[in-house]
Amino acid sequence: MAMTYHLDVVSAEKHMFSGLVQKIQVTGSEGELGIFPGHAPLLTAIKPGMVRIVKQHGEEEFIYLSGGILEVQPSVVTVLADTAIRGTDLDEARALEAKRKAEEHISSSHGDVDYAQASAELAKAIAKLRVIELTRRSM
């Protein structure tokens, strides 16, 4: 049997996941992180993206995160997300529309464009689309 640890994924709205996992993959402030059993304690910010969860028996689940905090302790890992949405609950049409609007906003020639905000919105839309794609592949 594979080594495991306890994972909690919590958002402001609800408790998204709680259970034993083999590993997770998440985008931290310094890049991609793979958290395996026995990982050193860690506290870091999470960028908009996804958490890829490999459960106790090898099944995968993908959850979109709009950002948050990752805490790693010896026997428990906690993801405190600003917003968390299961891949199966994401709306592809809305994500595509958000991506289109963000791209349009960035490319507009108006002087009042807030590029940082538009880029953040684009990153969130792309992350949602990636979670949708990976969720479909794992089914």
Curated annotation (Swiss-Prot):
Keywords: ATP synthesis, Cell inner membrane, Cell membrane, CF(1), Hydrogen ion transport, Ion transport, Membrane, Transport. One of its GO terms (cellular component) is plasma membrane. Belongs to the ATPase epsilon chain family. F-type ATPases have 2 components, CF(1) - the catalytic core - and CF(0) - the membrane proton channel. CF(1) has five subunits: alpha(3), beta(3), gamma(1), delta(1), epsilon(1). CF(0) has three main subunits: a, b and c. GO terms for molecular function: ATP binding; proton-transporting ATP synthase activity, rotational mechanism. Signal peptide: none annotated. The keyword Cell membrane applies. It comes from Serratia proteamaculans (strain 568). It is found in: Cell inner membrane. InterPro entries: ATP_F1_dsu/esu_C_sf, ATP_synth_F1_dsu/esu, ATP_synth_F1_dsu/esu_N, ATP_synth_F1_esu_C, ATPsynth_dsu/esu_N. This is ATP synthase epsilon chain. It comes from the Bacteria. SUPFAM superfamilies: Epsilon subunit of F1F0-ATP synthase C-terminal domain, Epsilon subunit of F1F0-ATP synthase N-terminal domain. The keyword Nucleotide-binding does not apply. Disulfide bonds: none annotated. Its main location: membrane. It is a peripheral membrane protein. PANTHER family: ATP SYNTHASE DELTA/EPSILON CHAIN, ATP SYNTHASE EPSILON CHAIN, CHLOROPLASTIC. Produces ATP from ADP in the presence of a proton gradient across the membrane.
